[in-house]
Regions:
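Aromatic-residue-lined binding/catalytic grooves and analogous aromatic/hydrophobic interfacial grooves
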Residues: 1-354
Length: 354
C-alpha cells in the first residue's frame, strides 16, 4: 500500500554513500559548465510503501478455501473477492475514492455472525510509529532518509474499523472483530508534501498530516457506505465512460483473464475472445491512468503508484526518455486530458528551480 507523496530525499550509491561528481580528465572550465547545468545532487529518493493491511481469519477452520475468485470491474473501478470456507461464502469488496481520498474494504458473509477477523497494520518504515485505540489504528512518522537536514517530509495514516460485531484493540496494531455480519474498513493516508509553483518554499508545508487524515476518516465514517461507493463510481465513470472501443467480431467473454492471455500468447483463442481481450486491455490501460494520475496528485511514476518496500526497482522515479511517454501517451488519445494535469503541473513546478 502506497501514499503517493511519500519518498525519501537523496541520491546514494549501492553502499548508501552520497554520490559525488568528479571529472578528473576534463578541464576545469568544462566541469564548471557541467556543474552549472546539473540539478541538486540530493534527488528525491525512493517512492516507498507506507505499509500493509492484513485481514487474518480467526474462524479456527483447518479447511482449504474453495471457489476462490477475484474480479476487477474496470467499468466501475471496484474489486471483489469471494471464497467458500466450511460452507460459508465470504465476500470482500474494495475501492479507492478520489473525491473523498480514502480506501474502503467491506467484508460480508452469508451466515450470521461468521466474520471473526483480526485487522492489523504493519509498516516497513523504520521510523513509523503504530498505535491502536478502540476501533482505530494510527501510524505517524517520516521516511528514513540520507539527508534529514533537508528532507522534512512527514506522513500519517489512519484506519478505522466499523462493524456490527464485537471490537477489541489488541497489542499495538490490531483491531479484533468477533461474531460480525459485516466489517467495513476505511483507510486514509497523507503527507505534508505540497507542490510549489515558485521557489518560495521547499515543497513541505506546515500541515500536520495526522490532522488531515483524521478529519477525512471522521467525515467518511459519518456517511453511508453505499453513498460513498456511488460517489466513487460517478467520479470514475465521468472519465472512463467517455470512450468505448469496438472491434469486429468481439463479444463478451466469461472466460478468466488468465485463460484469455494464455490463449492469446499461444494463438489458440477464438477470434471473438482475442478481440474481446484487446478491448479489455485497452480499457485496462485507461483504468490504470485514471487510478494513478488525478488532479491534485503527483504524476504517475515509472511504476504508476504501485510499488513494494523501501527500495523498489528504479526508485521508482520519472524517466523522461521512456516511462513518462509510456504512461501518458493515452491521456490525450483516449480522452483523459484531466489525467495529464499532474504531469504538466509537476513540470511547471520545476521551472523556477532550473
Amino acid at each position: 500500500m502506497n501514499e503517493f507523496t511519500e519518498n525519501n530525499s537523496s541520491y546514494v550509491d549501492d553502499d548508501g554513500n552520497v554520490v559525488s561528481y568528479d571529472y578528473p580528465s576534463l578541464p576545469q572550465s568544462v566541469t564548471d559548465a557541467i556543474e552549472a547545468l546539473k540539478g541538486d545532487k540530493n534527488l528525491y529518493g525512493n517512492y516507498q510503501s507506507i505499509g500493509d493491511i492484513y485481514i487474518d481469519d480467526r474462524s479456527g477452520s483447518t479447511s482449504e478455501a474453495e471457489n476462490y475468485r477475484r474480479v476487477l470491474d474496470i467499468d466501475n473501478a471496484i474489486t471483489t473477492l469471494t471464497y467458500t470456507l466450511d460452507g460459508v461464502e465470504y465476500t470482500r469488496e474494495y475501492f479507492v475514492s478520489n473525491p473523498d481520498n480514502f480506501m474502503a474494504i467491506r467484508l460480508t458473509a452469508d451466515t450470521e455472525g461468521a466474520l471473526n477477523k483480526d485487522i492489523r497494520f504493519t509498516t516497513p518504515q523504520p521510523l513509523g510509529r503504530i498505535s491502536v485505540e478502540g476501533d482505530t489504528i494510527t501510524m505517524t512518522g517520516r521516511p528514513q532518509d540520507h539527508r534529514a537536514d533537508i528532507d522534512h517530509l512527514e506522513f500519517a495514516l489512519q484506519l478505522k474499523v466499523i462493524s456490527d460485531g464485537e471490537l477489541e484493540a489488541v497489542n499495538n496494531n490490531i483491531v479484533r472483530v468477533s461474531n460480525a455480519n459485516e466489517i467495513i474498513i476505511y483507510m486514509s493516508a497523507g503527507t505534508n508534501y505540497q507542490q510549489c509553483m515558485d521557489d518560495s518554499f521547499d515543497y513541505f508545508s506546515d500541515e500536520i498530516p495526522l490532522d488531515t487524515v483524521s478529519e477525512r476518516i471522521q467525515t467518511v465514517s459519518a456517511k453511508d457506505y453505499d453513498d460513498l461507493k456511488q460517489a466513487h463510481i460517478d467520479d470514475y465513470r465521468e472519465l472512463y465512460a467517455r470512450v468505448t472501443l469496438s472491434l469486429c467480431g468481439a463479444t463478451q467473454s466469461d472466460r478468466s483473464t488468465k485463460f484469455l492471455l494464455s490463449g492469446y500468447r499461444n494463438d489458440i483463442t477464438s477470434v471473438s475472445d482475442s478481440r474481446y481481450l484487446e478491448i479489455l486491455y485497452y480499457q485496462f490501460g485507461r483504468y490504470l491512468l485514471i487510478s494513478s494520475s488525478r488532479e491534485g496528485s503527483l504524476p504517475a511514476n515509472l511504476q504508476g503508484i504501485w510499488a513494494d518496500g523501501l527500495y523498489p526497482p528504479w526508485n521508482p522515479d520519472y524517466h523522461a526518455n521512456v516511462n513518462i511517454q509510456m504512461n501518458y501517451w493515452l491521456a490525450e488519445s483516449t480522452n483523459l486530458t484531466e489525467c495529464h494535469t499532474p504531469m504538466i503541473e509537476y513540470i511547471n513546478s520545476l521551472v523556477p528551480r532550473g
